[in-house]
Amino acid sequence: MAFRFAVDCLGFENKPSEAIEAVLKYWSFHQDLNFILIGDEKAFDGLDILPKNITKKLANSFIEMTDTPLSARRKVNSSMQIAINLVREGNADVVISAGSSAVYASLTNDAFGKINKNTKSAFMSYVPTDNNNWFYFLDVGANKYFTGKELYFLGLMADIFVKKTTTKKTPKIGLLNIGTEENKGFDYHQEAFKLLKADKNLNFLGFVESRFLLDGICDILIADGYSGNLVLKAMEGTFKTIARILKRGYKRNPLAGLFSLGIIKSVAKKFDYKNNAGAVVMGLNKLALKTHGSADKQQFLSTIRLAHLSLKSDLINAIKTSLNNYEE
């Protein structure tokens, strides 16, 4: 099937060319796909000749990082709103943006609606671990507050995603908390714990502490968006700090760097968040993906790749069908 991607090329920290170049590169390996680039005249300057499967759509404004959901709704011709509308109206299958997270979560929720009355939208990212694996982590910033039942439904949706997109038939689910004891956390942790534990269709491990995340003990980690975002950014910052420390050390001792360069490059590539960028917006009736506000070409590529995987697995319909059993 010729999937159609709507890509918002404005409203993030880098130049629009980072998004455009990522699209061109990914399309060069997947020429059956269609891409719609949404930007302004300046973004498309010099981009006169494009492959027939890649088209441009002009916007007269963009969502700034200082915009609120309320102010963003007034920008009806912003690049983000146009991209979202393409999916809402059936003219694209997925929307991708690096714009404001709060605005994107709000506008996609308005346009697409909940996939189930019990769901709340959540950004689901993926994080590499030290056992040559990774885990899917949600919510990492779409919504600060969740009820226990809403966290439970995050687990249900992520479980479906992993089963559809990987070979894992019984993915291990963990619930982020400050300790592993069953009495830890707030009331919503307790409620979510009971629901997850009672569901015999889920492989629920229990509470998981953040210090064990990179050990690869779970395939799915559930958290409210506030906690999830803090943990994700702390990990990204830690990886960058370690890289700087190693770089300074090798400058002082080049010989040590020479002998360990291969290992260091392998580890750096694995844990570089640019290679693991992109978050699926779970809980909606249509497919949307979010990438970093500082996204570069590599991060857009990672996000497009994840979007393509989600489309090929027919993710939205799979979640809808499965959650029909949870209408109570």
UniProtKB/Swiss-Prot annotation:
Catalyzes the reversible formation of acyl-phosphate (acyl-PO(4)) from acyl-[acyl-carrier-protein] (acyl-ACP). This enzyme utilizes acyl-ACP as fatty acyl donor, but not acyl-CoA. Its main location: cytoplasm. GO terms for biological process: fatty acid biosynthetic process; phospholipid biosynthetic process. Pathway: Lipid metabolism; phospholipid metabolism. It is an enzyme of class 2 (transferase). SUPFAM superfamilies: Isocitrate/Isopropylmalate dehydrogenase-like. Pfam families: FA_synthesis (PF02504). Keywords: Cytoplasm, Lipid biosynthesis, Lipid metabolism, Phospholipid biosynthesis, Phospholipid metabolism, Transferase. The gene is plsX. One of its GO terms (molecular function) is phosphate:acyl-[acyl carrier protein] acyltransferase activity. Belongs to the PlsX family. Signal peptide: none annotated. It comes from the Bacteria. GO terms for cellular component: cytoplasm. It comes from Mycoplasma genitalium (strain ATCC 33530 / DSM 19775 / NCTC 10195 / G37). It catalyses: a fatty acyl-[ACP] + phosphate = an acyl phosphate + holo-[ACP]. InterPro entries: FA_synthesis (IPR003664), Phospholipid_synth_PlsX-like (IPR012281). This is Phosphate acyltransferase. Its EC number is 2.3.1.274. It is found in: Cytoplasm.
